[in-house]
Amino acid sequence: MKVLVVFIFCLVRSTFGQFEVPDALVEVFRPRGLRVSIPDQEGIKLFAFHGKINEEMNGREGGTFSRDILKAKNGRWTFYDANARLKEGDILYYWTYVDYFDGKNKLGYPNDDQKFVVKQLLDKDGAAPSVTPPTVTKAPPQEHTTLESGCKASVTTKVNERVCAGEQIFHEDFTTFETNIWRPEVKFADKPDYEFVFYRAGPPNLQVKHHRLTIRPVPSDAVFGEGFVSRREKVNLAPACTGVHGSIECVQTPGAFLILPPVTSAQISTKGKWSFKYGKVEIRAKLPKGDWIYPELYLNPVNEEYGPGYASGQIRIAFSGGNEDLCRDLRGGCILGSRPAARNYAVKNIVKNSGSWSDDFHKFIVIWKPDQITMMVDDQVYGNIYPPEGGFVSEAYNLDLVNVERWRGGTSFAPFDKEMYLVLGVGVGGHCFEDRSDATKPWTNNDPKSQKKFYQAAAQWGATWSNASRLEVDYVKVSAL
């Protein structure tokens, strides 16, 4: 009898203890802005929102609005799009999804076929919505990695999970700085580019304001005081250092011709937080202007499975030197190694007829496929990259590549066949600029005194730096193929 009672209790608990997706609160603001949120509950690990305006969803498609929210704020899991413009009478069709951990397993719970009719636009003052959220409909739990019916499988993966074709898998509009998505680097720059930079988190180098990310390079002496770069004492960035502890990324001591980096800047990435393989990346940004400054809009390998540095490749979404004689030339593509030939072999470029790429905002686009990479700017294709017969490894001798034998174990597109993460930053100097014979470049790349020589030429390059010497990023989007 006792066993029977226990069995009945467990059955009742299992039947009636099923998780229910919380009601979604929909708020539409004037003149623009859309916020959809659910209350936080213990066990919720992810909230996803997918929606369209005045168009019904085709099953669980990605939709016009599509985002995974990875962290609750102020007691709610919140999707917010500051640019969404809706009017009274519009209908928002949507579905939501929650990853829920019950103490043993993480299961996915969708809430399908929802709609919200806009009856009133709200001021951005936290006013209550005029329409009661729709009643939740129970749905059986599903594993998050299982593709739903009506979903066409994509070759794209995000964080090693399969996704639906055409789905928007990442969207950042910098409403706030999301530390659960972005990791600010705190380190001294080192290989493979040896830029003359000390990466810091926070002002004056890193700011998120007015829905834009701004990264600005600033001379180190202006931040820490005159003579900072050559003071004879050890500088240890631990425990905040994001580089390899104990290495020159975290600890440096000036002496003789060795100085600390003469420029402070910032670099953020989704390393360890979010990654993907294959897809369309779109970044709307204004590039920095000024001598020896360049944008760092990259895709870097997550695990460096083919080896350290460029042995595992890098995809450059947009690169343009800030010098007057370089800023008309936009370059993007695949970096195969640190030598000039390997840096240029799989890179495409487009030259602006007038003005520079840093004069205004542009859309920089990369379409990364298993056998091809397409480079675009403002929806114009300026290059396609294909692997040679035998793969990139077949060019090892011609390009003076080292430590690339592991590529033979990958696809013909190796090393560009592994998950990568996003990088946004600003670099200065280093090996990204080829040596010149006309003495207009104040250092040579293999000179151990290169950083000091750059610093000694500060009056020359500093005169070209201005308020335009900053990278401004409006948004970052990634969509599945």
Curated annotation (Swiss-Prot):
Posttranslational modification: The N-terminus is blocked.
The organism's place on the tree of life at top rank: Eukaryota
A GO term, aspect molecular function: carbohydrate binding
Location(s) in or outside the cell: Secreted
PROSITE patterns, alphabetized: CBM39, GH16_2
Pfam families: CBM39, Glyco_hydro_16
Residues modified by glycosylation: 467
Keyword Signal among UniProt keywords: yes
Tissue: Hemolymph.
Swiss-Prot/TrEMBL keywords: Glycoprotein, Immunity, Innate immunity, Secreted, Signal
GO cellular component, one term: extracellular region
Chain ranges of the GH16 domain: 211-481
Domain (CBM39) ranges: 19-123
Entry keyword annotation includes Signal: yes
Signal peptide range: 1-17
Any one GO biological process: defense response to bacterium
Major location category of this protein: secreted
Record Gene3D superfamilies: 2.60.120.200, Beta-1,3-glucan-recognition protein, N-terminal domain
Function of the protein: Involved in the recognition of invading microorganisms. Binds specifically to beta-1,3-glucan and activates the phenoloxidase cascade.
UniProt similarity note: Belongs to the insect beta-1,3-glucan binding protein family.
Name of the molecule in the record: Beta-1,3-glucan-binding protein
Species annotation: Tenebrio molitor
Organism placement in taxonomy: Eukaryota, Metazoa, Ecdysozoa, Arthropoda, Hexapoda
